[in-house]
Amino acid sequence: MLIYIHGFNSSPESYKVSLLKTFANKINMPDVLEVPALSFDPAIAMQQLLTLVHKYQTQQGMRPLCFIGSSLGGFYATWLAEKFDSRVVLINPAVKPYELFEDYLGYNRNIYTGQEYMLTMDHIDQLKKFKVDEITHPDRYLLMLQTGDEVLDYNQALEKYAAVPSIVEEGGGHGFTDFDRHMETVLAFCGVNCLKAYS
């Protein structure tokens, strides 16, 4: 099972999610991907994710679980990967989102859902609780970066995940331009046998 964790002010309707869903359907595995619609509130968002993981483990036992996190979702995915000893793909991940949130304090609106909400210092404090100081199993990570990220400094991720296998592309942007070129790489890393699925 793959759990995709979207970024701040994003949703399950994002571009990368649509590409992943299309590819999963193409290889006849539409149920391999879960994409929860997460709350803007970090504590609630993490509880949503933990509930989903617990549900999956209850239903599927110890079958492999892989997280795919984009931007803020990469920050959450890192914490979850360490907690559950899971594989994880990080796409232009936020390393210090609690610092970035300071620019968004106050009124915000989700461009996908239209939801309006207030971001407070309490939310920043919540985020800090999910900070991971040490990556214990770098081989379980795949880092994907584009140097043209206009939102995050990709060098922070290079430093944070220095020991992690990585794909670093020149140019691009925060949304990871031409992400569709990496579908098979991402799913294969997560343990999905694309060739078998095609047959």
What residue spans do the PLM features occupy?
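The alpha/beta-hydrolase serine catalytic core
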Residues: 87-199
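Active-site signature of alpha/beta-hydrolase-fold catalytic machinery across serine-
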Residues: 79-83
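Gly/Ala-rich beta-loop-alpha elbow adjacent to hydrolase catalytic centers
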Residues: 68-77
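Generic beta-sheet signal
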Residues: 2, 63-66, 141
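Short hydrophobic segments within beta-strands
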Residues: 4-8, 68, 144-146
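Active-site catalytic motif of lipid deacylating hydrolases and related acyltransferases
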Residues: 1-61
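Short beta-strand immediately N-terminal to the catalytic nucleophile in serine-hydrolase-like folds
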Residues: 64-69, 89
